[in-house]
């Protein structure tokens, strides 16, 4: 299995709740390497590039059920405050990160996942309040999404290769 890179965003609610350090520590403790990181406050145009139009198809069922434009709500949520964007690298990195993050809906996330431990708003509560589920974090869904998202959030020269102790112990003979 090759090392993969994936984009992770700590969304405004995670930043505002001072969870950045705790979340970073979990990824590093799992042997994932931070190869790029920055804090950014997304504007409308940038948020719409992240939540790109081709993702609208995924949200059709939610829109039917709740009568809300999911993409517009996600864009609004991403613009609410600063975001910490990072690129993580590791063996099977995309799947490892997604497993650590947990379900999209915090109340459905297992204990021990980032959302299961730090987020608590259910989709029913969020819908009753007419807000997006505050789920703290975004992680690329697959290799294709990771490639698109990484190139949106980072230039090539902002991503770095280096060895960690984990690399030396686990990957060098």
Region roles according to the model:
Residues 1-173:
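Non-catalytic terminal and connector segments of soluble metabolic enzymes
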């Amino acid at each position: 299995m090759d090392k993969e890179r994936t984009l992770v965003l700590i969304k405004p609610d995670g930043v505002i709740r001072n969870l950045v350090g705790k979340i970073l520590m979990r990824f590093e403790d799992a042997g994932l390497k931070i190869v790029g990181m920055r804090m950014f406050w997304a504007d409308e145009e940038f948020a719409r590039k992240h939540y790109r139009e081709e993702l609208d198809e995924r949200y059709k069922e939610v829109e039917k059920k709740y009568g809300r434009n999911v993409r517009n709500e996600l864009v609004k949520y991403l613009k609410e405050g600063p975001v910490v964007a990072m690129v993580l690298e590791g063996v099977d990195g995309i799947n490892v990160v997604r497993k650590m993050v947990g379900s999209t809906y915090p109340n459905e996330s297992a204990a021990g996942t980032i959302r299961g431990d730090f987020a608590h708003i259910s989709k029913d509560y969020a819908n009753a309040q007419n807000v997006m589920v505050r789920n703290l974090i975004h992680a690329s869904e697959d290799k294709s999404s990771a490639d698109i998202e990484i190139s949106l959030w980072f230039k090539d020269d902002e991503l770095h290769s280096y060895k960690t102790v984990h690399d030396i112990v686990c990957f060098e003979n």
